[in-house]
């Protein structure tokens, strides 16, 4: 019977066989163990599970939000057009199942409706903030469940906000600054200059510089492209200088030479959507979908959601430090809070018992006093009744005596009458 031998790890000396921090030794293996296939397992699992990406589009009505999304994914996702006659800002939410090769993407697009159409625009950002917080709250409640299933949970948190800026060519509107200021701590903001084909190339660059200057001066934090990852560093370095992206959307195909391209046909020529000399659409698409989608999701979870979670748990009485300012785990916090809640329940239960017993004693005293009053009243009435009975008995005896005397007198009267009648008869007989 063949024996199965295990390949033993051997230490590779480096710099005099030094050890790393925490006594972690760098080792290599001889032979095949199989854990080199872990990346393949993750890829297979991710493909099987599919991916989720949630986009929030904020901009005035008719600025081209739906058209740009259709252009990004090269399909018609939305047919109906929004009206300009909304009394309040609303949100339209649509979820789509997209597939490219063997990769499935569940895409959720949230678009503002009626944004910027009101006379009083001061609170236009509030429905957007409320929606983002509601998605954070839903995820937090799922996390706090005893039997939670985040693997199967549909993550509806907003991963990126495409903020559409009107191509005025001058500066940002007060509404833009107010909204982005209230959103920058909750979502990854990517500013876009919509309908960039309405501005000349020189004016467009001036407008970009003006926008970035206003964002910085107002302390508005937009999404910072990561440059610390090797795969994305070079691409992001070349793109970061283009912010805000000047974009044009179109799903129509026009003929340029002998080929059909997506673009817009004007009397003066053709604007090609995917021509980098005409607009920044290709740069935006590559940055958003090809390079940084996972980073946007990771930053949403580790920064924006964690900030919301921390503030929410603080309001609930949870902290991430102990009495001596030492960091503690969430499990320790939960157990301490659970014990505190249990002790509080015990105290409140004891207080309720004491209050109940006190009220019982008070009621018993009230009942005893009422019982005594009733007993005294009963005795008084009983005494009155007995006195009445005594008087009636005396009256009865008196009446009975009077009746006896009456019958005696009656009998005597009857005897006298009988005697008189007899004497009268004798006198008559004697006369005869």
Curated annotation (Swiss-Prot):
GO terms under biological process: cytoskeleton-dependent cytokinesis; neuron migration; protein localization; protein localization to perinuclear region of cytoplasm; spermatid development
Disulfide partners: none
Resulting phenotype, residue 123 to T: Found in patients with teratozoospermia; uncertain significance; sperm heads are malformed and contain vacuoles; chromatin packaging and structure is abnormal with an increase in fragmented DNA; decreases sperm filamentous structure formation; loss of SEPTIN14 and ACTN4 localization to cell filament structures; no effect on interaction with ACTN4
GO terms under cellular component: acrosomal vesicle; axon; cell division site; cytoplasm; cytoskeleton; dendrite; microtubule cytoskeleton; perikaryon
Domain Septin-type G per the UniProt entry, residue ranges: 49-315
Region described as G4 motif: 194-197
Heme recorded as keyword: no
Residues binding GTP, per UniProt: 59-66, 114, 195-203, 249, 264
A single MF term (Gene Ontology): GTPase activity
Keywords linked to the UniProt accession: Cell cycle, Cell division, Cell projection, Coiled coil, Cytoplasm, Cytoplasmic vesicle, Cytoskeleton, GTP-binding, Nucleotide-binding
Record's subcellular location: Cytoplasm; Cytoplasm, Cytoskeleton; Cell projection, Axon; Cell projection, Dendrite
Summary of subunit composition and partner proteins: Septins polymerize into heterooligomeric protein complexes that form filaments, and can associate with cellular membranes, actin filaments and microtubules. GTPase activity is required for filament formation. Interacts with ACTN4. Interacts with SEPTIN9. Interacts (via C-terminus) with SEPTIN4.
Function field: Filament-forming cytoskeletal GTPase. Involved in the migration of cortical neurons and the formation of neuron leading processes during embryonic development. Plays a role in sperm head formation during spermiogenesis, potentially via facilitating localization of ACTN4 to cell filaments.
Family label: Belongs to the TRAFAC class TrmE-Era-EngA-EngB-Septin-like GTPase superfamily. Septin GTPase family.
Protein name per its UniProtKB record: Septin-14
Upper classification of the organism: Eukaryota, Metazoa, Chordata, Craniata, Vertebrata
């Amino acid at each position: 019977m063949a024996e199965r031998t295990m390949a033993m790890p051997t230490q590779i000396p480096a710099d005099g066989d030094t050890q790393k921090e925490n006594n972690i030794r760098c080792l290599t293996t001889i032979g095949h163990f199989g854990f080199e296939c872990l990346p393949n397992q993750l890829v297979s699992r991710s493909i099987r599970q599919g991916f989720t990406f949630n986009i929030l589009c904020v901009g005035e009505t008719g600025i081209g939000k739906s058209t740009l999304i259709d252009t990004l994914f090269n399909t018609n996702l939305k047919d109906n057009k929004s009206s300009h006659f909304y009394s309040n800002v609303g949100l339209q939410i649509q979820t789509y199942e997209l597939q490219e090769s063997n990769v499935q993407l569940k895409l959720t697009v949230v678009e503002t409706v009626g944004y910027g159409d009101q006379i009083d625009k001061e609170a236009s950002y509030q429905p957007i903030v409320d929606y983002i917080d509601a998605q954070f709250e839903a995820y937090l409640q799922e996390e706090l469940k005893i039997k939670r299933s985040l693997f199967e949970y549909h993550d509806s948190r907003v991963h990126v906000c495409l903020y559409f800026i009107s191509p005025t060519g001058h500066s940002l509107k007060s509404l833009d600054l107010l909204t982005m200021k209230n959103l920058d701590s909750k979502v990854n903001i990517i500013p876009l200059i919509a309908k960039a084909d309405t501005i000349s190339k020189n004016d467009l660059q001036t407008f970009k510089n003006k926008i970035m200057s206003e964002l910085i001066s107002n302390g508005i934090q937009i999404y910072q492209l990561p440059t610390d990852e090797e795969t994305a560093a070079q691409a992001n370095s070349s793109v970061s200088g283009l912010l805000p992206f000047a974009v044009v959307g179109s799903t129509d195909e026009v003929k340029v030479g002998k080929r059909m391209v997506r673009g817009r046909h004007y009397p003066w020529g053709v604007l090609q959507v995917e021509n980098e000399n005409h607009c920044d659409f290709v740069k935006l698409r590559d940055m958003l979908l090809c390079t940084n989608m996972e980073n946007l999701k990771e930053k949403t979870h580790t920064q924006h959601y964690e900030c919301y979670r921390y503030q929410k748990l603080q309001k609930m009485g949870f902290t991430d430090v102990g009495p001596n300012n030492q960091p503690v785990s969430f499990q320790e916090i939960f157990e301490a809070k659970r014990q505190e809640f249990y002790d509080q329940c015990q105290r409140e239960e004891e207080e309720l018992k004491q209050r109940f017993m006190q009220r019982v004693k008070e009621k018993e005293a009230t009942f005893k006093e009422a019982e005594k009053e009733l007993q005294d009243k009963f005795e008084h009435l009983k005494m009155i009744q007995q006195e009445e009975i005594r008087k009636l008995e005396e009256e009865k005896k008196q009446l009975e005596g009077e009746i006896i005397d009456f019958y005696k007198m009656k009998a005597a009267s009857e005897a006298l009458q009988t005697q008189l009648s007899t004497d009268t008869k004798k006198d008559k007989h004697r006369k005869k």
